[in-house]
Amino acid sequence: MRKPIIAGNWKMNGTIASGSILIEAFNSVLQDMELSCDVVVCPPFTAIERAVALTRNTAIEVGAQTMDYHDAGAFTGEISPLMLTEVGVNYVIIGHSERREYYGETDETVNAKIKSAFHHNLNPLVCVGESLEQREAGHTIDWITSQLKGALADIPKEQVSQLIIAYEPIWAIGTGKTATAEQAEEVCKAIRDYIRSLYDDDAADAVRIQYGGSVKSENALEILGEPNIDGALVGGASLVVDEFIDIIKAANQVSA
């Protein structure tokens, strides 16, 4: 059975001080829970080092929201995988739709970042998703498999099995709209089937697939109960203690 993973993407929210308060609140609740899921928080880069210190010897791991695929060089403003490993990061989000839209990231860029992440022993959390126009035109599956084809070029089976893929319909990110559990399951199953066609049953059965897109406590249990959904990439709700904890509890419940 695949272990669910709940990851909180704080985006460009929070300071070192406010992030510390959040993590301490999470710790105070989670220390009394027997977890059957992985929990990751992805603060802004300036707050990562403090987050790592606060989560040491706890159930929470720390991720970054993006990275460059170069180790060093004249890339003003970028953060390298070496910098992330130095501060103690274990996970990194790659290819989020906001990075693709606002910063021009392509499937080729995502592919280079995945390779670099694995090279530096970082766990890549790779985002894919369709626009509202693509969904309404019936192109969802074709678009997402196209994204995966580019992102996974020359990635060996052993690494794919360790991937986390997050299905985030662009039309549901930060809009309050959420795919139904049936819609989310349909796409996550298609992702798993595509991995099976590219690799084999072992790789498809091992890869963890999250749903992201306005996940809240009120819809988490239904979504996480679907057979091909192995967790959630949580945005705004990960900045609210009770909301994020309730989503973690939902993951615990379905994996018990």
State where each predicted segment sits:
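Active-site loop-to-helix "anion-binding N-cap" substructures in soluble metabolic enzymes
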Residues: 1-256
